[in-house]
């Protein structure tokens, strides 16, 4: 089964995503900020990463995405941005940073699961 990293500064979001995704049999790792997301991604090499954009002090989700895509050890890990940043310019920044998919909050559990399943089926 897949291992997923959820990076969001808000505990309720991480909990909701963890509960939703664990019903699929996936192992869920968590990070509360960009720095922790980079550390966990490099150490654990998850199958897929879910990244918020605004995660408090430190690198934001766009920066984390760019950094991971530039790292030979993590460049092939698919990244889904999960964020309230819904403008077309934000989406363009996310995809330019290397995101595989871009979902805006609020998102539905089935939308999230279907998105992840689709990406994992291609890897």
Go through each PLM region and give its residues.
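Alpha4 helix (beta4-alpha4-beta5 surface) of REC/receiver domains from two-component response regulators
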Residues: 59, 63, 86-103, 114
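Charged docking surfaces used in two-component/phosphorelay signaling
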Residues: 15-23
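Active-site beta3 strand of CheY-like receiver
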Residues: 44-50, 55
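Short amphipathic alpha-helix used as the core "switch/output" element in two-component signaling
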Residues: 39, 62-75
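C-terminal output helix
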Residues: 107-116
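Short hydrophobic/Thr-rich beta-strand motif most characteristic of the beta2 strand and flanking loop
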Residues: 25-32, 40
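His-Asp phosphorelay/catalytic-motif detector in bacterial-type signaling
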Residues: 45-47, 73-78
